[in-house]
């Protein structure tokens, strides 16, 4: 049996390991000193401690990961998402070390990871926002004046929504330019940055692609709407997008497939676009499995990790485009260990974690358990809740019920935000964009009324809490999470996440 080293941590390791076992591969894992009690270790047949706590000591340390793969005699290396997943140097080290990298080739990663080169290729197929790479402040000021403010300053080799700065004035640019170059160098290994026209409040829509260079077969699995974001990082995704007509969807998919064919893409990846006033703008290529891949799996019935393994192992991409039929609607909520108002990471120990069991309408991808101490060194993602239904309305209701049955205590989480977001009229009507969070209403002017309503219903559910001091009324009163669109009070579930 062949071994697959999953060079990552947390829920994505568990997700990949389950498919490895299903297909007859042996999943192997790594863990840091900070992750010695992590749940993903138990889902791997073999594991190795690669030491350290900070990412550059372990999950970003190519030499330690390659050494671990050799010690466990692995055949494949799956990078998951984040960390080294889109690093062309890592893919090359894997290949040079005699391992099969489960992802695109070194050359494709080099192209797709360079935002300037990727835009050059895409510009022959799809509209792109005006801009270019800049090396000096005076050059950047001249370009920004030419294309007009606001502009966005990005790391040329950046990704994952990190290091982006929207700038409204020349003073903003002067303050940010050198800082951005330093951040780009420390985070992505290159201080190169580029400036482009900032498209304000667009919708963010991506297309899931599978490619097999051995047969030149490129197919799509539909689009995903990813417009609800904080700090340019996604919080809620859904498929299909409510923004698209059949005509605009066909155009979007045609452009995405053509771009991936042009670069001879191999394995799983996505092409991301901004959508504003009926026009698409190419954004970037994500050359890895996405955090939100599960909603595509729910509507298509296709295991994307299985396809990755089939392609990498030489079995090939056997799916035929005309036989892929998406059914229903799916939503994903990313539950993070964060303050739900400021989205500030809040590591700590989970006192209690209760989640609904997976069923035909709800899927939970998580590495959380009661008593787990969340390390402060890594991403704040705790769990992904995926709901599906025959239509969007049913999928939303299934997600609401799942959120209200969750229990995470001991640390703050973004569950109150998600419940509130799913009750927002803009989301319910599918007419939202990337400014969604900035314009959310928290009803802070009705604190007294909401607090009174809570106290009225408190005696009925008091058995859910042992200590009344655990109830944070400020948190409860700031959100309209406890009211559905018809105004019914959700008192039955308040105490499940009141603290």
Protein language model regions, located:
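Catalytic cores of soluble metabolic enzymes centered on carboxylation/carboxyl-transfer
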Residues: 256, 296-297, 302-499
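N-terminal beta-alpha lobe that positions the nucleotide/phosphoryl donor
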Residues: 1-271, 275-290
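Exposed boundary/loop context
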Residues: 3, 73-75, 156, 182, ...
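Short, contiguous acidic/charged loop-to-helix segments that flank catalytic cores in large enzymes
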Residues: 243-247, 295-300
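Short loop/turn segments at secondary-structure transitions that flank enzyme active sites
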Residues: 227, 291, 337-341
């Amino acid at each position: 049996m062949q071994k697959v080293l999953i060079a990552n941590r947390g829920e994505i390791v568990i997700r990949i390991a389950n498919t490895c076992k299903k297909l007859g591969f042996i999943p192997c894992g790594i863990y840091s000193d900070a992750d010695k009690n992590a749940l993903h270790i138990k889902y791997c047949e073999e594991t190795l401690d690669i030491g350290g706590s900070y990412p550059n000591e372990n999950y970003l340390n190519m030499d330690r990961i390659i050494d671990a793969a050799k010690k466990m005699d692995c055949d494949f290396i799956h990078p998951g998402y984040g960390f080294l997943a889109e690093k062309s140097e890592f893919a090359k080290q894997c290949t040079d070390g005699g391992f099969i990298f489960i992802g695109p080739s070194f050359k494709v990663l080099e192209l797709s990871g360079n935002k300037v080169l990727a835009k050059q290729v895409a510009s022959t197929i799809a509209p792109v926002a005006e801009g270019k790479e800049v090396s000096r402040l005076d050059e950047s000021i001249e370009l920004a004046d030419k294309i007009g403010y606001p502009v966005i300053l990005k790391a040329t080799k950046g990704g994952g929504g990190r290091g982006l700065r929207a700038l409204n004035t020349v003073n903003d640019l002067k303050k940010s330019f050198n800082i951005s170059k330093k951040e780009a160098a420390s985070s992505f290994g290159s201080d190169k940055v580029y400036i482009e026209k900032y498209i304000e409040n667009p919708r963010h829509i991506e297309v899931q692609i599978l490619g097999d260079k051995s047969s030149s077969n490129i197919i799509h699995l539909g689009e995903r709407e990813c417009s609800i974001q904080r700090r340019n990082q996604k919080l809620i995704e859904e498929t299909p997008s409510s923004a698209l007509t059949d005509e605009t969807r066909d155009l979007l998919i045609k452009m995405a497939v053509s771009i991936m064919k042009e670069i001879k893409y191999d394995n799983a990846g996505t092409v991301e676009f901004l959508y504003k006033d009926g026009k698409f703008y190419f954004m970037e290529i994500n050359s890895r499995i996405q955090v939100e891949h599960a909603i595509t799996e729910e509507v298509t019935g296709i295991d994307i990790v299985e396809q990755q393994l089939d392609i990498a192992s030489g079995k090939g991409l056997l799916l035929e485009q005309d036989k892929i039929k998406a059914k229903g609607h799916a939503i994903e909520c990313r539950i993070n260990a964060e303050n739900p108002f400021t989205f500030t990471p809040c590591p700590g120990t989970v006192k209690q974690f209760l989640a609904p069991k997976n069923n035909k309408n709800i899927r939970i991808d998580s590495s959380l358990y009661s008593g787990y101490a969340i390390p402060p060194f890594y991403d704040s993602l705790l769990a992904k809740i995926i709901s599906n239904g025959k239509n969007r309305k049913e999928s939303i209701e299934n997600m609401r019920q799942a959120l209200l049955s969750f229990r995470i205590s001991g640390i703050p989480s973004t569950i109150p935000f998600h419940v509130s977001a799913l009750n927002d009229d803009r989301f319910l009507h599918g007419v939202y964009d990337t400014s969604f969070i900035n314009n959310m209403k928290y009803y802070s002017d009705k604190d007294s009324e909401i607090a009174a309503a809570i106290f009225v219903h408190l005696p009925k559910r008091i058995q859910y809490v042992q200590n009344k001091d655990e109830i944070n009324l400020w948190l409860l009163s700031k959100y309209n999470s406890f009211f559905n669109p018809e105004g019914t009070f959700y008192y039955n579930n308040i105490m499940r996440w009141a603290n």
